[in-house]
Amino acid sequence: MSRRSTAEKETAKSDPIYRNRLVNMLVNRILRHGKKSLAYRILYRAMKNIQQKTEKNPLSVLRQAIRGVTPNVTVKARRVGGSTYQVPVEIRSTQGKALAIRWLLGASRKRPPGRNMAFKLSYELMDAARGNGNAIRKKEETHRMAEANRAFAHFR
């Protein structure tokens, strides 16, 4: 067993324009091949698009979208006696936010081709804030799975 003490968890940094940690988390998930300036450009264009379309504060739309997509429970595969069970597990808020961001970006990448990523992301965020879209569908599907496998909750 290690004699070292557990490392302090670093607080997430905030982005330069909105000064928000959530925006920075989103940028770090958009990031591909180390091109952070491109990731920032994509997100800020998406935010500008949201501002123009909804005439609301884009940060509040982003928060609402992430709050709507964040799951409370998820299922984990657990092997017991030769068979695998999908065991429902409650998740912490930070883990839930990370999942929500991942689902939002996945849903926006899967949107029909033709427009750029900023456009797709802005529309996915607006849909999620309204309560529909593929990311919301993914959350509901996860909750349904957890509800269906509630009988296996004691395997935790």
From Swiss-Prot:
Instruction: Extract the GO molecular function terms from the UniProt entry.
Output: rRNA binding; structural constituent of ribosome
PROSITE patterns attached to this UniProt entry: RIBOSOMAL_S7
Q: Name one GO biological process term.
A: translation
What are the entry keywords?
Chloroplast, Plastid, Ribonucleoprotein, Ribosomal protein, RNA-binding, rRNA-binding
- A Pfam family for this UniProt protein? Ribosomal_S7
Q: Which InterPro entries match?
A: Ribosomal_uS7 (IPR000235), Ribosomal_uS7_bac/org-type (IPR005717), Ribosomal_uS7_CS (IPR020606), Ribosomal_uS7_dom (IPR023798), Ribosomal_uS7_dom_sf (IPR036823)
Gene Ontology cellular-component terms for this entry are: chloroplast; small ribosomal subunit
Which protein family is it in?
Belongs to the universal ribosomal protein uS7 family.
Matching PANTHER family: RIBOSOMAL PROTEIN S7
The protein's name in its UniProt record: Small ribosomal subunit protein uS7cz/uS7cy
Give the species.
Cycas taitungensis (Prince sago)
The UniProt gene name for this protein comes to rps7-A
